From Swiss-Prot:
Gene3D superfamilies: Aldolase class I. It is found in: Cytoplasm. Disulfide bonds join C112-C336. Binds 1 [4Fe-4S] cluster. The cluster is coordinated with 3 cysteines and an exchangeable S-adenosyl-L-methionine. GO terms for molecular function: 4 iron, 4 sulfur cluster binding; metal ion binding; RNA methyltransferase activity. [4Fe-4S] cluster binds at C119, C123, C126. InterPro entries: Aldolase_TIM, Elp3/MiaA/NifB-like_rSAM, Methyltransferase_A, rRNA_lsu_MTrfase_RlmN/Cfr, rSAM. Its cofactor is [4Fe-4S] cluster. This is Probable RNA methyltransferase RPD_2859. GO terms for biological process: rRNA base methylation; tRNA methylation. Its EC number is 2.1.1.-. It is an enzyme of class 2 (transferase). S-adenosyl-L-methionine binds at G162, E163, S194, S217, L218, H219, N293.
Length: 359
């Protein structure tokens, strides 16, 4: 990593109640909240659980303190030079801490949130899976990241630590809680779920009544190259991933975005661009081209501007909608692929990335 922050966070402690207040409140829909046994939660309305965002309601804080339960907190561990991006450390009851990112825009804020404690898919270009998968985040833990990132959040991207579709039930429950009209009433059109593409889960997602945005981390045009870049996805055929994603797009009448990380000498040839164009021809799809965000110890390189331009032009000539995506927060290791699983002191968990250049 460009800079591994190591901050003491004494207020992030192990909770006496593992579920914590999130398990009793932020992890519930309004109907579930209304059905709680009388006295289980203080005299707080469902909406008050989410507003104001920055701090939990005082009555909820006092109630939690009287029972020896600490509310999870979000601690800032980095801010980029322009002040547009902030990296946060979200402490968990079991001693782990996942990273979230707040991105400021002129028309609101974007919350980049995590869905798992670690990741099982070991993407070659990403720091988040270096320690493997420890556990899934609960719906309340997912929702609480958004709540603590502040009232100006109007876009949510599941692009932090973890594979959202590998935690399907809790992620979908979190989205429903965020959408609940009696709570945050968050528009689903402001929610983007980014996934490597698990065909079975994509088929299930197709039947959900959720008008979210879907991004598929594709990154290759052949199974061989994708298996090298995303070892955990070897059992998911590339063609089936694309087919399921496009079926979702047709079902919901909205385009699916395919993210493509352009890596020199690996997947950046004109032949790759032509294969990608052929793969997506006449599909309700668009492409986001991305540059690699450096991670310490990973033998990859950022693609030169000229190669990226040639790749983009090839797609445009084939009439495939394409943009080059700009990434915020790279100078504080808060960009895509740079988030680490940490402990409560802010130290990275698990092994560092493998040394050496990918061949």
């Amino acid at each position: 990593m460009a800079s591994a922050q190591r901050h003491s966070t004494p207020d992030l402690v192990r909770q006496r109640d593992p579920a914590g207040v999130s398990g009793l409140s932020l992890g519930l829909t309004s109907s579930e909240f209304a059905g709680l046994h009388e006295g289980a939660v203080p005299d707080v309305t469902y909406r008050e659980l989410f507003f104001p965002h920055a701090d939990p309601p005082r009555r909820l804080q006092n109630w939690a303190r009287s029972r020896g339960v600490r509310l999870r907190t979000l601690t800032r561990i980095g801010r980029d030079q322009g002040g547009r991006s902030e990296k946060m450390l979200f402490g968990l009851h079991d001693g782990y801490a996942v990273e979230s990112v707040l991105i400021r825009r002129f028309d609101g804020h974007t919350a980049c949130i995590s869905s798992q404690v670690g990741c099982a898919f070991a993407c070659r270009f990403c720091a988040s899976g270096q320690a493997g998968l420890m556990r899934n985040l609960e719906a309340g833990e997912i929702v609480e990241q958004v709540v603590r990132l502040g009232p100006k959040v109007n876009r949510i991207v599941f692009m932090g630590i973890g594979e959202p579709l590998n935690n399907y039930q809790q992620v979908l429950k979190a989205i429903r809680i965020l959408r609940d009209r009696q709570g945050m009433n968050f528009p689903t059109t402001g929610i983007t779920l980014s996934t490597i593409g698990i065909p079975k889960a994509l088929k299930q997602l197709r039947e959900e009544h959720l008008a979210i945005n879907l991004t598929i981390s594709l990154h290759a045009t052949t199974q061989e190259v994708r298996d090298r870049l995303i070892p955990g996805a070897r059992k998911h055929p590339l063609g089936e991933v694309v087919e399921r994603a496009c079926a979702w797009a047709r079902r919901h009448n909205r385009p699916v975005t395919f993210a493509y990380l352009v890596l020199p000498g690996i997947n950046d040839s004109i032949a790759d661009a032509r294969r990608l164009a052929a793969m997506l021809r006449d599909s309700p799809a668009r492409v986001n081209l991305m540059r690699w965000n450096p991670v310490d110890g990973v033998g990859l390189q950022r693609t030169p501007d000229r190669s990226l331009a040639h790749f983009r032009t090839t797609l445009e000539n084939a009439l495939v909608p394409v943009v080059v995506r700009d990434t915020q927060g790279r100078d504080i290791s808060a960009a895509c692929g740079q988030l680490w699983l940490r402990d409560l002191k802010g130290l990275p968990v698990g092994n560092r990335p493998r040394q050496g250049r990918m061949t």
